[in-house]
Structures are given as structure tokens and as C-alpha cells.
């Protein structure tokens, strides 16, 4: 299955909203881990975004999946970028 990098960009204005929805966001990510979709995720050191490594059938299916993140549903993500990642090349 292809591997994708999913990058979120946040704005400082959404910080409190992200705090409010963080528990649901993390539960959603844990479910992706349980389903073996999410391989790795970590926020950026400056808290301006997050990078995640995921498996998916194609770019569109990954974009559709991440549209259901509680952060996305609450409009707390400034930008989502999904790109296929070819490891080891």
C-alpha cells in the first residue's frame, strides 16, 4: 500500500480551539494507529503544524479520511497537504 505524508499547518488563532478538541483528535489518531493506517505523527517544535506518515490507497482517499479529523471538522487547520512518499529512494 502506498505511503503518504500528511502535513497540517496551524495558525496561532486556533490554539485554544485545538486545546478544546485535542482529546478527540488524539482518540481519532489512536484509532488510525489501531487500524494500521497511521505509522507516525508528531507536532512541529514551534507548534505551527503536524506531520504524519500514513498508508492509503491513493491521495484522494487519504484526503477524504483526514477531512474527518476532529481538528478538521472544527475548522482548526489552516492548510492540509498530502503527498505520496516513496521511502528509500
What are the language-model segments listed below?
Residues 1-89:
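Conserved, structured core segments of small domains
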